[in-house]
Amino acid sequence: MSVKIGEISYKERIDKGIDNDFMRQAVSSAQGRFRKGRLSQAEELGNWEDWRQLGSEIRTHTLENIDYYLHQLSEQVEKRGGNVFFAQTAEEANEYIENVVKKKQAKKVVKTKSMVTEEIGLNEALEKSGAEVVESDLGEWILQLDEDPPSHIVTPALHKNRQQIRETFADKRGYDKTDSPEELAAFAREQLRQDFLTADVGITGCNFAIAESGAITLVTNEGNAEMVTSLPDTQITVMGMERLVPTWEDMEVLVSLLTRAAVGQKLTSYITAYTGARLEEEIDGPDDYHLVIVDNGRSKILGTEFQSALHCIRCAACINVCPVYRHVGGHAYNSIYPGPIGAVLTPLLDGYDDHKELPYASSLCAACTEACPVKIPLHEQLIRHREIIVEKEKKSPVSEKIMMKGFAQWASNPAAYKLSTKVARTALKPWTKDEFVENGPGPLKGWTDVRDFPAPGKQSFRAWWSERAKGEKQNGNS
């Protein structure tokens, strides 16, 4: 399994994003709104940097002792009658879940929003085995109907407008009302209600698993998690192995950071906590509970210079300030995980072969690092990825290597440099208009296809300096 969402080339995805005016406007508007909310909530707290430091320390401590806390978590879950399965790979996770679904003879599975289940391709695996899978998060449900991957970690359907959503509902579910948000939401609620009531198995992700109690917490705004965790007889939680905290107090800190950093709220509408199978004295919840803990490449990141990437609490604060994401959108990253955190995490989970461009999808402005509520040094990790790509993986294009080698030889030869600056203006004259090079030749074409390149000056700095020095000397002698 792969975190990739398609086979279209990186350049084609970027071009498609840049040409999508609605998407760019929607992303820009959302980024501004989320950023304003985050800054407002940080100011209201008054000691935001102290909270960030505490969040970073909690994540660092947890990962440095992850074996202990995973063991504690599994003990607590099993103590309450749950089943725990450690999946080394996506295939192992999917196979285990498929077997549970088949054993229950389940025809319908209902899910909450979950990045890790998208990462391992769980929906596709279950559908191949004959089960109907229904996403219950509104954004994810829209995308599922339209067979479209998410473009944002928190707001997966950010790239769609309400007219497109209405068309999807009409084509796939016979919707015949207007595109007003209220009517669209009411229709989705009516449709999903039937799925909740008829589902045989409920599958959730996990925001934070609490090691000391075995509790699983879900942070949502729609209330769908309550339905998924209380109605089906069989419940399966799928979590990345890093998604745990030692105590309830640690969870409180990270949830406070998560909600403020993600959407600028003190709290989301719902924070759900559940602890496995239903006990005799309880009136709702599943009879059978399974916790699937997924590695899928994460253990290889532990103990490396990229370990802090696993601190991520999936708030998307880095995405909400990224200028590259603003212009190209989430699909350009060709990964379930877009934005700066995706550019760091995707090559670690899936290798450089298909994702060697991602570390370069950054201006290195460090806005992502500044926004991250758990202080992941994202821009530094992007630079390190670039070093590895060039020095170890040897993934740089041959043309780029030849070009850079030629540039080095040219720039280190004063005579060649001086001559080229003299002839450059004349050589580029056929492509120059109003002091800018348009539709330039050779290596300049990639640049000038999307923006104008300043034409060489009428006089080089070197010549100007020489004339200035001569003038001062003459004035001094007069």
UniProtKB/Swiss-Prot annotation:
Sequence ranges assigned to domain 4Fe-4S ferredoxin-type in this UniProt record: 303-333, 352-381
Pfam families: Fer4_8, LUD_dom, LutB_C
Protein name in UniProt: Lactate utilization protein B
Domain of life: Bacteria
Positions bound to [4Fe-4S] cluster 1: 312, 315, 318, 372
NCBIfam families listed in its UniProt record: LutB/LldF family L-lactate oxidation iron-sulfur protein
Protein keywords: 4Fe-4S, Electron transport, Iron, Iron-sulfur, Metal-binding, Repeat, Transport
Molecular function (Gene Ontology), one example: 4 iron, 4 sulfur cluster binding
Stored SUPFAM superfamilies: alpha-helical ferredoxin (SSF46548), NagB/RpiA/CoA transferase-like (SSF100950)
Species this chain originates from: Oceanobacillus iheyensis (strain DSM 14371 / CIP 107618 / JCM 11309 / KCTC 3954 / HTE831)
Job description of the protein: Is involved in L-lactate degradation and allows cells to grow with lactate as the sole carbon source. Has probably a role as an electron transporter during oxidation of L-lactate.
Coiled coil: none
Family affiliation: Belongs to the LutB/YkgF family.
Binding site residues for [4Fe-4S] cluster 2: 322, 365, 368
GO biological process, one term: lactate metabolic process
